Every structure is written in C-alpha cells, then in structure tokens.
Amino acid sequence: MCFAAKSENAGGDRVDGAVFGEMRQREPEFGTPLSRDDVARVIGIAVDEIPLEWPIQPVSTGLTFTIMPFRNRQALSDLKFSYIQAAEFLKETGANFFYFLCPERREGRLEARARMFFYGGEDPATGSAAGCAASWMVQHGVAKNDEQVMIQQGVECRRPSEMHVRARREGERVTDVRVGGYAVEILRGTVVL
C-alpha cells in the first residue's frame, strides 16, 4: 500500500524530512454510554479518576472503540489491567477495544494523551481509534468544531507518536473526521508477486 495514494495531503508539508499525510474516516456512530462504576471495576481504577462531565462511550468510524476519558495523565500512565477481563466486558457493549484518553488544554491548545491495549500488547499509534476520539471530543464539546487536536500515544510503551485529529459538527451530526501525522520514508522498492 502506498501511503500517498490513500491520503489526501501526502507530500505537502515537510518538516525535517518527514511528510504530513491525512486521511478521512467515515461519519461516526455513537453507542450508549457505559457506567462509570462498571468500567472502573473492570479496569481496576478508582471511579473518581473518571471525569463526571464526559461519558464513557463506544464510538465507531468503522471499528468500534470505547472512548474512556481520564481525569489526569498520571492515572492514565499508571494504568494496568487484565485485557482478558476487559475484552469480556467490551464484548457485551459491541466495542472491540478501550481507547483511554486524557484531554487537556495547554496554553489554549487542546492536546490529549492516549493509550490502547490489545491482545496482551500496547499499540503506539491507533489511527482508527484516534478518529473515534476526535468524533467523541467534538460531540461532547471537549474540542471545538474543526479544532485540530494533537494526540500523543505510545509514550508508556517507549514508542511515542503524535496524531493530529479533527472533526466537524453540523447540527446533531459529527462529520469530516480526519486523522493525520508525519511519517518518514524508511524503505523504497518494488515487490513482484
């Protein structure tokens, strides 16, 4: 797969040899919010680590992630839980994975730290989940309409990444969900099948 062929902006902005690419995701579908108490019990955290003002909610732009907000980055960084227990819980909700998110405004700019665990591992950059998070942030007023948010992921597994996300709100609908980031070419060649 050629990154440039699948993105809308690939080849445009370059920074230190890296090129920025952005992809558009499907319009989101929002599931029924989950109980703070149930989720806190399943992932083994104190319920007061979960903000009251934002729901824990399954969101899909193709693959369903349960967006689980955290009150602070330290609690998110310290997170350790049983993936098997969480997977059993998520199966009942229709979601595939949790996407743990801690959004914060810093100097007027919205940034977020995120984590995504799967099958015993941790993913350093989950674009499909980041699009769901962008949709969730716009839907619940965490992010402004079409505001670019930088999501840092992979810090705790020592593979830090940055994804730039945004989405628009048109009436009751969230649309134009975009996920982008910088990439560097590490290999070029031809594959003959």
For each predicted feature, which ranges?
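Active-site proximal loop and beta-alpha junction motif in alpha/beta enzyme cores
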Residues: 1-193
